[in-house]
């Protein structure tokens, strides 16, 4: 007999009845607010073409490395799940069979945020009322895949149903942004922006750096083998992105290191980099210098700068060689911010024209470094609990460890940072519930009045991300 799938109305709210009652009232004021999704990795082609999603596997399993990394950890080969290889090929696996494998292992996700999000998607988006397991796999696959062929489940219809006010995707400087142009020219009212992510032409250790740099020069007409031309190329592409609606840039570096070299020093370093002779230390220094140059450009063009450092990318070499990037083998690292950011903050930390949103995968830095920095420098804001820490527990720890030094208003609310489009409402719902629970505790302890908590809850869910990202 199938087991019912139930979403409890009080999920993630406090167990204490009095505090829970406060949290319910706070959550009621934020639950239906529009979604501001200022940073993420959805595919703009979805909204440009508005083509139906293919099937349950292609939509909910293949793009979601949160999910398939857990299955891989338990010995499930990624070929069994239909995950594409680095060269674009795939093992000849039937999507239904891949879904059956996933369904048979769904219990591995118990207690994880992925289970929270997926059960929300199953229940709220697809009206499924039994749990996913081996016995219900085909029912789920058929029900979801059939729904995806209907007009109500086209990307634009879902965007509107989810009450998304604005969503930002993330593109390389080499992207033509043709999908964003198609969206703008279509007459559709949905607001889909881009963000400038230049990692492939900034990181000498990126496997595509040499070829990307050549394309960068060809695209811009600049001599990107010389430092001044390289910087002009960035300015040109940033202006192109801004004209297409971008309000932010994003930088995914191994560390938070910044530097402030003289033009002559930067040119000498750049010469070494473009010859392919940079040592790891020189590659790190180059990334550090480019971050400071990006900050200088943000002062001029007004784009908000995001920094997502501290991840050892592609830790599993064999997996990377077979499947490429973003396949669940990225591991958090210890990250320094106090010393690393100082060269950049010395130049721009007090400049009212500059805004830097910093994220971390190193929770030990919250109260020791990041909250004190954000609680001092006018230009610096804290991004929300990110990636390995966007579980309810991680969101709670973020608030506990940053509130004393940074308050609420040196943070930027929530962003979902996901490729999994259908999980966006679930992720924002979890954040709103956790913040309601956290604020309810402060009210119950008489640290906030309820009207103050109500205002903060709305600010965190809606106003702060709009303000921080200039939306």
Curated annotation (Swiss-Prot):
Pfam families noted in UniProt: UxaC
EC number: 5.3.1.12
Keyword line: Isomerase
Entries under Gene3D superfamilies matching the protein: Metal-dependent hydrolases, uronate isomerase, domain 2, chain A
Top class in the EC scheme: isomerase
Top-level lineage group: Bacteria
Family: Belongs to the metallo-dependent hydrolases superfamily. Uronate isomerase family.
UniProt protein name: Uronate isomerase
